[in-house]
Amino acid sequence: MQPQLPIEVDAQTGVWTTDGLPMIYVPRHFFVNNHVETEAAVGREVYAPALYKAGHRSAYFWCQQEAATHGLAGMAVYEHYLKRLSQRGWGLFSFVAADPVTGHAQVQVDHSVFVLAQGIAGVPVDRSKVCCLFAGWFSGAMDWVLETAGSALRTTSAESQCAAEDGAHHHTHCVFTVSPL
């Protein structure tokens, strides 16, 4: 299978774009090793909230741009977001459930980059919830949907299960739960 994303490369600058947004193409182990070492240096209690805020802001911006680029609205933008994340190698993202009126959603992530990279190229094995980078993405997208529908409701998102977790019940995928603040 070939990539499903349109990729343009500027001949003058070498900048890659998809749907008009600049992209960076890096090996998975490079990104995950940088992520893991940053978390180790500053601690998850500091790093996770910073990732959440940045991810929320980026997802909101992405939804705004993609809605304009493709003429999409509402949950179609959020669905397109999950499709594009899946096409970019982060994992396979799908809704278990979603309600744009109440701000509730559950997003399933199969084959998360953070789970698959463990034990490869120096990435340590961690049997906890390791996919926290995604959390802000899902509330950012839902908040965009809510705001553009005229709702004042805002959401939060958290990883409720991770395929990396070790314990009585091994999970084959990760789940993120989006709920109103």
Q: Where do the protein language model's features map onto the residues?
A:
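Active-site or metal-binding loop neighborhoods of secreted/extracellular toxin and effector enzymes
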Residues: V145
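N-terminal accessory segment detector
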Residues: M1-C132, G150-S157, C162-V175, P180-L181
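Mixed-charge, glycine-accented linear interaction segment located at domain edges/termini
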Residues: F138-A141
